[in-house]
Amino acid sequence: MNKYELTLVVNAKIEDDERAAAVEKAKEIITRFGGTVTEVEDAGKKRLAYEIQKMKEGFYYFIHFEAESTVPAEVEQRIRIMDNVLRYLCVKQEA
């Protein structure tokens, strides 16, 4: 199994519970496809480098997980359609 890091930029204008629900949904998607979430890091609210959907700030989350090589594509496909996620990036971590 490979190690991956999924970075989520979540809408800053939503309530805390909605933001937590978006992160939980991302974790659920990872586990649904056979991945194991090892760590979730909340980096807090940060200013965006450029405006996204008329927003200047977003909450950053880093989700570390282990999975087979086919899982990141499935995860990205589902996260792409989540309403409260402004941007995402899934990268393979070095061993």
Predicted feature residues:
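Structured, basic alpha/beta domains of bacterial-type, RNA-associated proteins
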Residues: N2-A95
